[in-house]
Curated annotation (Swiss-Prot):
Keyword rRNA-binding: no
Subcellular location field: Cell inner membrane
UniProt-recorded name of the protein: UPF0060 membrane protein ASA_2267
Segments traversing the membrane: 7-27, 33-53, 63-83, 87-107
């Protein structure tokens, strides 16, 4: 059960980070409202707070989170940007998820 909670938390964290970066991107590149920076900032604060909820060393969390971030970014590419991922995008994201699983769930000495 801890594994599902960890993965779920990583997924929510990745969405918070991507939203926090995507909204300023819209402002800078597409001339959208400067007011997008407010929810972007709040999303990045949420992102940092969510990372703090993991009960393991920060470096391990950041390393493992990167694998989930890659997976969510590929989903974002497809669902938000409307660009279908290539086979290699999918393979790469699965390799990253496998790496995350090794980092987070490998047996460790007590």
């Amino acid at each position: 059960m801890v594994e599902l909670k960890t993965i779920g938390l990583f997924l929510i964290t990745a969405v918070a980070e991507i939203v926090g970066c995507y909204l300023p991107y819209l402002w800078l590149t597409q001339g959208r409202s400067v007011w997008l920076l407010l929810p972007a900032g709040l999303s990045l604060v949420l992102f940092a707070w969510l990372l703090s909820l993991h009960p393991t060393a920060a470096g391990r969390v950041y390393a493992a989170y990167g694998g989930v971030y890659i997976f969510v970014a590929i989903l974002w590419l497809w669902l938000v940007d409307g660009i279908r991922p290539t086979l290699w995008d999918l393979v790469g994201s699965l390799v990253a998820l496998f790496g995350m699983a090794i980092i987070m769930f490998a047996p460790r000495p007590a």
